Amino acid sequence: MRHYEIVFIVHPDQSEQVPAMIERYRTLVTSNGGTIHRLEDWGRRQLAYPIQKIHKAHYVLMNIEVSQEVLNELEHAFKFNDAVLRHLTLNTDEAVTAPSPMMKEEKSKSLLAKDEAAAPAPAPATEQATA
């Protein structure tokens, strides 16, 4: 079996259905003897250029290990799902399990937001009148 990295972009109006789509694709991979090494839901992001007059879309990344038949079936499912605007499949040499740069960026943003919320606001300086 070979290792693949797949990114697919879902129409923003179908964002509520993304968890069900992920689960459907996950069962397709695992039921046929494949394994999922990394699965990341990047959420709704700005597109680099409009696709079908759409400027934002929902991104999902999968790193999987499957046979060619399962990959063909998965790409067929992407092709005939109207909610999937684009998909890209890359062949990788080995399983990638580390968080992607996109997820590292999200975690750092969320950690910064938590730190700012947790840090107490500095007390306002009070002036003392000297007589």
Curated annotation (Swiss-Prot):
Keywords: Ribonucleoprotein, Ribosomal protein, RNA-binding, rRNA-binding. GO terms for molecular function: small ribosomal subunit rRNA binding; structural constituent of ribosome. Residues 103-117 have a biased composition (Basic and acidic residues). Residues 96-131 are annotated as: Disordered. One of its GO terms (cellular component) is cytosolic small ribosomal subunit. The keyword Kinase does not apply. It holds the Pfam family Ribosomal_S6. Transmembrane segments: none annotated. One of its GO terms (biological process) is translation. Residues 118-131 have a biased composition (Low complexity). It comes from the Bacteria. Belongs to the bacterial ribosomal protein bS6 family. Binds together with bS18 to 16S ribosomal RNA. This is Small ribosomal subunit protein bS6. It comes from Methylobacillus flagellatus (strain ATCC 51484 / DSM 6875 / VKM B-1610 / KT). The lineage of its organism: Bacteria, Pseudomonadati, Pseudomonadota, Betaproteobacteria, Nitrosomonadales. The gene is rpsF.
